[in-house]
Amino acid sequence: MAKVIGIDLGTTNSCVAVMEGDKVKVIENSEGKRTTPSIVAITEEGEVLVGEAAKRQAVTNPENTVYEVKRLIGRKFDDAEVQKDLKHVPYKVIKADNGDAWVEVRDKKYSAQQISAFILQKMKKTAEDYLGEKVTEAVITVPAYFNDAQRQATKDAGRIAGLEVKRIINEPTAAALAFGEDKKPGDSKIAVYDLGGGTFDISIIEIAEMEGEHQFEVLSTNGDTFLGGGDFDSRVINYLADSFKAESGIDLRGDRLAMQRLKEAAEKAKIELSSAQQTDVNLPFITADQSGPKHLNMKLTRAKLESLVEDLIDRSMAPCRVAMKDANLATSRITDVILVGGQSRMPKVQEKVKDFFGQDPRKDVNPDEAVAIGAAIQGAVLSGEKKDVLLMDVTPLSLGIETLGGVMTKLIEKNTTIPTRKSQIFSTAEDNQSAVTVHVLQGERELARDNKSLARFDLTDIANAPRGMPQIEVTFDIDANGILHVSAKDNQTGKEQSIKITASSGLSEEEIKRMIQEAEAHAADDKKARALIEARNEADASVHGARKAVEEHAAAPEHDKTKVTEAISAVENAAKGEDVEAIKGAVATLMAAMSALLQSAAAGQAQAESGAGAQGNAKPDDVVDAEFEEVDKK
């Protein structure tokens, strides 16, 4: 049975896991790490680097290194949050033809879905290397507060990466699945506080034991898709830049290279301050002026860090209050608090969470791996490998349509369990109105203009009738991925119009297919590049071995040594080119020449030894055998 892998596609780091028997295995990547940086870089030669390789060269190649692209996925370029982020990233964010936020790297435009697909391809390859088989299906997690456009965009990224996305599930829900695997028997209500690299979610989840089955029901969810560890880093970066400017008079913000170094130092300092009270930020040769090079060297205390980010931590408390209210629960009813996401390791965050819920959060759930583990469990459920789990997730935001006066009329309220289907009858606003426009909205505001527009479509050829008489049945259908399908039907004529919301900020089918082809081409290019590297490595090793053999067998016949020397030159010339087969052919010729040399050398050595042996056994005439006796030593 083909495995369905679980992928946590994170803002800062990503993780992949798979169910093996009754246990979940978090899979190490090719560098031996259990998480992979969600970073993609394009080199001068056009090679795509993902993960650690991309992170290592970020300081010297900041404008061509894309990170935190999850904050752009499914978003418009003109969104206020995107505009705010533009000031903090060294790479170029552009407005695509459809209004989306894309990135431009080395004069080529990439959608956020394409960049995410590079990361997903790395996760897919990591799983394939471990399992020893092709992987085509996955469960991918998203922040609970992702809207329809962001969910669809994530699913598209999976397709571009060559994965059939069997299910999109919410990150806190996945973490709850991971926690539920090892929890003690009995019913419980848990709060999952998920503060990751770029997003924040809070979910209240009930875990019930039903005839040996774990039933997970999400009671409520809330969050902020633009609050995460990256925002904490930005506060530290700005503090360091301001302090350096006050000290030296130089503003580092105009220097991309310096800012990339500052970003890495800020992240490192923040992490260190989770276990230490003070840390040194030391960046020699950060910049230079007429007087010479300048060095950044300053101390950062935990207290200072906490004062810099206190309002960000407080911002996470407001969604917690809303989630508890929506779940209709007092904090005293929560049995366990689970922390997810790397930023939740910060002591001040844990202190605030403890104060809010009135109990210490659990420390036995790995905040970096829990989401991928939960996704793998859901993958095993979908493949039929695991049968004792039932998951009931919710839609995070209300869905409805625009009605007379620019009002949003909700058909599906937020925190409704999915999948779900709701219908409502609407009518015309004018006499003899022959068409209606169905404007689909997502959000909690009363007026249509204040909510997110998902799509518009028209139902035409409505029979002439006075206003209010035609019956237009609008149906909203949300699937298990939280993706919406909408239909409108004239009950008198039976005419129907429907739409799958691919979101007004999504990619067209043609664009997705083109990007899939590009991704496959990249995979083919990567394979070709790897084959070339391996062939060159083999060539290098064979040349080294051949030279050593010629030195060691100096007495071998001259024509054999000449053949090897000529073959070495041929291999070196072939290795300068990019023809893998030519390199392999030259290496094969060298190996044959080497074999002939070694055979000749061995034959020569055997002949020399037999000659020396025969000579050694003959006694010259003047040699006399003598008797001797041993004399005791005094």
From Swiss-Prot:
One Pfam assignment: HSP70
InterPro entries documented for this protein: ATPase_NBD, Chaperone_DnaK, Heat_shock_70_CS, HSP70_C_sf, HSP70_peptide-bd_sf, Hsp_70_fam
Compositionally skewed regions (Acidic residues) per UniProt: 623-634
Protein name listed in UniProt: Chaperone protein DnaK
Organism annotation: Acidithiobacillus ferrooxidans (strain ATCC 23270 / DSM 14882 / CIP 104768 / NCIMB 8455)
Extent of Low complexity compositional bias: 601-618
Phosphothreonine PTM positions: 199
Gene3D superfamilies: 1.20.1270.10, 3.30.420.40, Actin, Chain A, domain 4, Substrate Binding Domain Of DNAk, Chain A, domain 1
One annotated GO molecular function: ATP binding
Record's keyword annotation contains Phosphoprotein: yes
Function in brief: Acts as a chaperone.
Induction of synthesis: By stress conditions e.g. heat shock.
Family: Belongs to the heat shock protein 70 family.
Region described as Disordered: 601-634
